[in-house]
Amino acid sequence: MKTRRQNLAFLFLIILSNVTVAQKSIGIFDGSGDVGIGVKPGHAVYIPQTQQYIISGAGYNVWADHDEFQFVWKKMKGDFILYTQAEFVGPWVSIHKKVGWMIRKSLDGNSAHVNAVEHGDGLTSLQFRRSPGAQTEEHKLKITHANVLQLERKGNQYIMRAAKYGEPFTTDTVTGIDLGDEVYVGLFVGSHNSDVIETGVFSNVTMTVPFQDVSDQRTQMTLGSNLEIMEVSSGKREVIYKVPHSIQAPNWSPDGKKLLYNDGKGLMHTFDLATRTPKLLNTGNVKANNNDHVISFDGKMIGLSSSVRELGGSIIYTVPFSGGNPKQITPKGPSYLHGWSPDGQSLVYCGSRNGDYDVYKISVNGGEEIRLTDAKGLDDGPEYSPDGKYIYFNSVRSGSMQIWRMNPDGKNQEQVTNDGFHNWFAHISPDGKSMVFLSFLKEEVAADIHPPYKNVYIRMMPTAGGSAKVLAYVYGGQGSINTPSWSPDSKKIAFISNTVVAPTGAVAGK
């Protein structure tokens, strides 16, 4: 197995072999070049296979009243959220070299700007120049050696979030910086030495245009969607498909060949991972499907949740994985499916009866439902462990939303997580060793709601107990990972992140 150092060394060889290559556009960016006068020429390369940017730049500094650095940029307007994981690579000279995100009013060396930066010595800071030629100011974050950098613009407010991968963000903010509506946005590298070129590698780069109409985020699912897969051991993310509308809650088929998701219009689709193409799934006259759908452990059947107003809302159905006419399972709604039993004989779901949402179980043949929880407040997201010993679920009974588990008959209910987040939708890996779940910030949402279009974490922890680790820093929430999404080898997960996507047709990732 290659070590991280070996991987970075390999990337450095790629850099050296591409120093003379000119690219008109670089990945998602419009252009690149050196900022400043008389700067030693730098260069930038995009590696489609890994979706990484390798940027090399020189320059005296990004500081004082003017800057010198290599910049890979895109023009953007309005509000946006920038995210990357950044690493230095190769031999280096100055501890003050810099990598990070930059937002500039112009490409002039003395332009007003805001940047989120990691230094060679580990200093992590939010830097800004309020007007052309003014002195650069700095907010030093409490964290050092951050390799996860996020920079968000909300009007004239700029929010920096930084973390060591696996940990929650540390945040700082500056307000009153007027860079104009249209700005240059991108990644930068500066060497802090005019005669030396330094190199940074940027992974998992996203530029998110967030939801603008905040009148009711609970029901409006209108943003574009990125279908992503992630390797949980390394954190490597890959956008494999993007569309300008809502798709939600990917499930991974047990044979590893396909994903299953719903769209915002209530239709179901399979996605071939080899060809990276979607296909509409025939679900007969059941065409108001929501994001609570699950594939059976043997891969032969799909459980659906679909709205039927006359029956009280969401109703559970089953249908063959190849499609067909669904069979109604639950007699009344709302009923939101979250899990199959490993033997394929039972379904577990969240149901509202008499004004309270609890966990229920029912035979795949229908019949009488069995109530498994009766605590006051919302119980949701029930899912069997692969060995069938537990049903995991999330409950607000403690005052915050946390992960719980119980025996399949509802006995021995015990709390699993207890931390500073609202935790939803635990999904157990096929090998039974790990679980991933969605974490909302308590300062942003109430305990009993899980809205879309929020800065959220997908976290992982051992099922045997221990600390949770952040796997993915995501703009999403509702619809991102509502139902099981592990690959059958327990090495990857699939999920949805959201952004405005130009309506030029669906684009498959490379």
What name fits each language-model region?
Residues M1-K24:
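Bacterial Sec-dependent N-terminal signal peptides
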Residues K2, V19, Q49, Y83, ...:
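Intrinsically disordered/low-complexity terminal segments and short unstructured peptides
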Residues T3-R4, Q23-P41, M221, S225, ...:
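Extended hydrophobic/aromatic-rich secondary-structure runs
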Residues N7-I15, D178, D272, S346, ...:
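Acidic/proline-rich low-complexity IDRs
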Residues L8-F10, T20, I54, N115, ...:
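Compositionally biased, intrinsically disordered low-complexity segments enriched
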Residues V19, S94, Y158, G303, ...:
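Short secondary-structure capping/junction motifs at helix and strand boundaries
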Residues F211-K510:
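Sequence signature of WD/YWTD-type beta-propeller architectures
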